[in-house]
């Protein structure tokens, strides 16, 4: 597995899978090839997206399809020098962008060979030649005019929320001061009451942080020259160049900040708080106008409508002492930034005790909300479905299904993707930065939470 320290984090986007693909000009015949030498195939695969600028070829950037095509050329399955994306007719079931991970995706493309193709060997050859971030589950022939984007009926994503992201803001920050209006408002329904009551219980979290920081301060005051950070080695730290001496006050500052991280790390979400999250997420289900959750110039455009089949919270799990909440979102297709904004909107409502009706208001084409994007490194494409295609498969063609690869898929998830996601968060603290920006914001971007 490629070291996490060598992978540059990239923020992902999720373009709409149902947008029309631009029509390509008529392809010229490739020199030195015959139509009989062209074979169209389907590749089922999964991958960790770190270091990649998405799946789609976008030269000169490093992409998943770019690596696959390069390996196919090296293995002799593209017997020409002037092959390009147009002649490959390459397509995918779900277009993932920078940094997005995938357990189950599909690409389809043309091969150009000068001898009979033994497709049974291709999976093994690809896995041996590709980096360990990309794993091929299966390779088999495709119908001549197969379009995976259109044939794919649904896409399922998973978004990992760190439990500490549901904690209230610091009492000293601007967001906490603004949200006092929300805490004192009239509570119109049970969900509103549950939200506020769960918030009141969590205010004590910051007392725990203060006590921990007080212990650190007392240790420092006793003997500042001999002070040692009790959290040293517990959290990622940038290497200190040789010969550099860290002043005592700098050591104290770092220890006080890491005391806060320590409390975050040990926080475990309570059932009532988790229930509020699930009830709010359920409001996304159904067909809605998601104009506030993407980039659009026309809030009334029919293209803003999406059908969300389900949004569910999984059981929180602990990985290397940090607790995470998996949220699964299933829908037909998704627009640019849609899932990240959906998650951010819910987190903002919970953390500020805002009216729960703000989710419904966000669907109103006459209301504009400047919703932030939550971090993208925790987004994972879990599944794609081709039920109608599978029902219509004839002439000995294989169905598109992943059932017999579940063990390998689980291994990719547990051994590569999850560790990459979580270690990156620990190293870059992307959620900490996101929440800190919101908590310290003094402008008017988030005024819709307190109106």
Swiss-Prot record:
E.C. number = 5.4.99.-
Q: Which reaction does it catalyse?
A: a uridine in tRNA = a pseudouridine in tRNA
**Chief location category:** nucleus
User: How many cofactors are bound and how?
Assistant: Binds 1 zinc ion per subunit.
The positions annotated for binding substrate are 157
A GO biological-process term? tRNA pseudouridine synthesis
Residue span of region Disordered: 1-30
> What is one GO cellular-component annotation here?
mitochondrion
Q: What's the cofactor?
A: Zn(2+)
* Active site, renumbered: 97 (nucleophile)
Instruction: Please provide, alphabetically and separated by semicolons, the GO molecular function terms listed in this UniProt record.
Output: metal ion binding; pseudouridine synthase activity; RNA binding; tRNA pseudouridine synthase activity
Keywords (alphabetical) are: Isomerase, Metal-binding, Nucleus, tRNA processing, Zinc
Q: Where in the cell is it found?
A: Nucleus
Task: Give me the stretches of Basic and acidic residues compositional bias.
Answer: 9-30
* Source domain of life: Eukaryota
Q: What does this protein do?
A: Formation of pseudouridine at positions 27 and 28 in the anticodon stem and loop of transfer RNAs; at positions 34 and 36 of intron-containing precursor tRNA(Ile) and at position 35 in the intron-containing tRNA(Tyr).
Q: Which family does it belong to?
A: Belongs to the tRNA pseudouridine synthase TruA family.
What protein name applies here?
tRNA pseudouridine synthase 2
Say which species the protein is native to.
Schizosaccharomyces pombe (strain 972 / ATCC 24843)
Q: Which gene encodes it?
A: pus2
